[in-house]
C-alpha cells in the first residue's frame, strides 16, 4: 500500500528531526572526546586539536543548524535573531581556528619542523582561510546596504553555497587529522572508526539541510 504524500512528509520531517538531533550530540560528543584525549594544557600542541574540533565540529555545526526548521535550538526566535546568533558562532569558530592554527605553527617552530607538509595541515589552512572569507561575506547579509548593487537573493545563494564548501573543508581537515600519528597512536580499533564517522555524519546532515532547504528550492524556482 502506497503511503500518502502527507504521511511521507511526516516521515521525512521526523527523519530530519532525528538526524539534526544526532548532529547536535555527535558534534558535542566528538569535541569532548578530543578534549579528553588531548588534555589541554599538558603541552602547547594539546590546544591545537581541542580548538580545531571546537571550531569545525561544534561551533560551526551549531551555527549552520541554527537555520534548521526541525532541529535549531533557537527555532522559536525570528530569523533575524538566528542570523545574528549564526554570525556570532561563526566568528567564535574562526577565532578558535585561528588560535589553533597559530599554536600549532608555534609548536612546529619550537621543534624546528616544516609547516604544511601534510594533507591535514594544508586542508586545515584552507579551511581557516575560507572561514575568514565566509565571515566577511556574511557582513553583506547582516548589513545589505554595504552591497547595494547585489540582489539579496543572490547573496544568500552564494553565501549558502560557500558556507557549505567551507564546512566540508573543515570536516575534511578533522577527518585527515584522525590519520595523524598523534591520533592513531592513542585511538585504535572500533573507537577510531567511530571517531571517523563523526565528521562524516555531521557533514551529511548539513549537506542535506542546505541543499534541501535552500539550494534545491532555488533550483526549482522558475
From Swiss-Prot:
Q: How is the cofactor bound?
A: Binds 2 heme b groups non-covalently.
Residue ranges annotated for the Cytochrome b561 domain, each copy included: 14-217
Read off the Pfam families from this record. Answer: Cytochrom_B561
A biological process (GO) of this protein is:
ascorbate homeostasis
A single Gene Ontology CC annotation of this entry is:
endoplasmic reticulum membrane
Q: Which residues bind heme b 1?
A: 48, 120
- Lumenal topological domain ranges are 39-46, 107-122, 184-186
Keyword Heme, does the record have it? yes
The record describes its membrane topology as: Multi-pass membrane protein
Residue positions annotated to bind heme b 2 are: 86, 159
Subcellular location per the Swiss-Prot or TrEMBL entry: Endoplasmic reticulum membrane; Cytoplasmic vesicle membrane
**What domain of life does the native source organism fall in?**
Eukaryota
Give the cofactors, semicolon-separated.
heme b
State what this protein does: Transmembrane reductase that may use ascorbate as an electron donor in the cytoplasm and transfer electrons across endoplasmic reticulum membranes to reduce monodehydro-L-ascorbate radical and iron cations Fe(3+) in the lumen of that compartment.
Q: What's the protein called, per UniProt?
A: Transmembrane reductase CYB561D2
